[in-house]
Regions:
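Extended alpha-helical targeting/anchoring segments
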Residues: 1-196
Length: 196
């Protein structure tokens, strides 16, 4: 499912899903990068106003955690090769949750490389592995990193509990250090069994 910023949904059901190996990797192409400036959905002043608004809401108790995000956008050339970008990401920034989707019939082309597994489902069992806390080494993690991870685990437990059998939700791992090229993340595992 792809959701635009405006809220439009595109759902794609694949007949088959195969893990990529050397034989399935996209062909090498010429990824030439993007030239010219990127656009941001927030100015610095708008971002700072958003931070102040969040602080007020946290102090008032109306929110627990907020991720203030902005959209970076760039005009794309007509001859853009998303598969080439996907291959470049795979070679230079290998990530456990990487992929390339080419579905031109519905206007979807995605190259992604993420260290985070938002949600997996195996039969009736679901697991989320949120990441909060990033440093160059595990020893450089700050108390703030552990506190943020515990906070997101609490939120994920609450969210999963809404659709899982009572008593089945648990934290299988808390604040596990997971190494990636050039950095370490704190990762926790939250799981439960879906209500049938």
């Amino acid at each position: 499912v792809v959701v635009t910023f405006e809220g439009a949904l595109t759902a794609i059901r694949f007949r088959t899903v195969r893990e990529a190996g050397p034989q399935l990797s996209p062909p090498a192409g010429a990824w030439r990068g993007l030239r010219g400036p990127w656009r941001s959905s927030l100015t610095q002043a708008a971002y700072e106003d958003g931070v102040e608004d969040i602080r007020e809401r946290v102090a008032a108790g109306t929110v627990y955690q907020v991720n203030l995000c902005r959209i970076l956008s760039h005009d794309l050339p007509e001859d853009l090769q998303v598969a080439a970008l996907g291959r470049l990401l795979d070679e230079r920034h290998p990530a456990p949750y990487a992929g390339t989707i080419h579905a031109p019939e519905v206007g979807v082309e995605i190259a992604c490389a993420s260290p985070e597994s938002y949600l997996q489902r195996h039969g009736q069992h679901v697991i989320s592995r949120p990441i909060k806390g990033t440093a160059r080494t595990a020893a450089q993690m700050l108390p703030k990193d552990f506190a943020e991870n515990v906070m997101i685990v609490d939120l994920v437990r609450n969210d999963i509990a809404r659709v899982c059998r009572p008593g089945s939700v648990g934290v299988d791992a808390l604040c596990r250090a997971e190494a990636h090229p050039g950095l370490v993340h704190l990762v926790s595992d939250v799981s439960g069994d879906l209500i049938q």
